[in-house]
Structures are given as C-alpha cells and as structure tokens.
C-alpha cells in the first residue's frame, strides 16, 4: 500500500519579520518550504504599539518611521522569495505582535507560520522569545520555529 505525497501541504506561508537574524533565517526556510510545496509567502511586519506606549503618537513621523523600517524588512523577505521564483505578498500592520500575527494568519488563510526564535528583544527575551512563544501557544495553524544560528 502506498501513500501519496500531498504537494499542496502549505499553500500560504506567513513569515513575520522584524529584520532580526532569526527572522531572516526564518524567511529563508519559509521560501525553501514554499518552493517544495508550490506555496506562496506572506511577509508581515507589525508596528509594535507596545513600544509606543508612553510616547506621543502625535510626534511627527513616529509611526511613519517605524513603518518605513518595516517596509525594508518585508521587502527583504519578498526579494528572497522572488529570487527563488516564489510568489510573495507583504503587509504592515499596527498592533501587538503576537496577537496581530495570529489574527493575520487567520484572516488570510495561512497554512503555516514560520518565525524566528529570537527577535530584536535581546537579553530581555527568554528561551524562544516572547512573541514567538505566544504565537506557538495561541496560533490556530502549525508554527515552525527557526533558530538564527541554524545551519
């Protein structure tokens, strides 16, 4: 008895990015999976409103500056995908990262989330990173974590 390989296992792969080494490595891994399963990539950057608390959102350019930073990060993911012949789309959302990533995955029919284990939080992050840990616990789709130093 043979089991057929399911080619369309991951049609839509979500790659949240913050420009960190972990998210860059996650994007590369996601593109490999998209190639293997003929899927596409959704690059997502979340402007973290938690970082903005206590700051005046009326300061000229405060949100714009963070969105511009995010555009660079998601463009890197899109370029990686397109260079491999994988279709890619991108989005910038305003919110709390873990919650926004999960909502985006649900609203856009993502089959898989590929996320780095450590973002830009440095030493304040524990083992996985607080955003990654929350996404792993709460997402309604499979989550694949990728270490920044993974070969």
Where are these regions (language model features)?
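Acidic, proline/glycine-rich short linear motifs
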Residues: 45-72
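General small-molecule cofactor/ligand-binding pocket signal
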Residues: 44, 89-93, 144
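Short, solvent-exposed amphipathic alpha-helices that sit
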Residues: 29, 66-77, 100
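Short, well-ordered secondary-structure micro-motifs
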Residues: 26-27, 53-56, 102-103, 125-127
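Small/aliphatic-rich secondary-structure junction motif
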Residues: 6-55
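Structural beta-alpha unit
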Residues: 2-8, 79-113, 150-151
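Gly/Ser-rich helix-loop-strand patches that form or flank binding pockets
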Residues: 1-2, 107-151
């Amino acid at each position: 008895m043979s089991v057929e390989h399911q080619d369309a296992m991951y049609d839509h792969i979500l790659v949240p990015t913050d420009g960190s080494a972990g998210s860059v490595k996650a994007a590369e891994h996601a593109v490999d999976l998209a190639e293997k399963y003929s899927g596409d990539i959704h690059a997502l950057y979340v402007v973290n409103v938690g970082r903005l608390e206590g700051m005046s959102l009326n300061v000229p350019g405060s949100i714009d500056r963070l969105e511009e930073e995010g555009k660079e990060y998601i463009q890197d993911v899109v370029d990686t995908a397109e260079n491999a012949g994988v279709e890619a789309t991108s989005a910038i959302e305003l919110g709390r990262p873990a919650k926004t990533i999960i909502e985006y995955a649900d609203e856009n029919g993502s089959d898989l989330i590929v996320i780095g284990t450590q973002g830009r939080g440095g030493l304040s992050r524990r083992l996985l990173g607080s955003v990654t840990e929350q996404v792993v616990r709460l997402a309604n789709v499979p989550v694949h974590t990728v270490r920044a130093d993974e070969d």
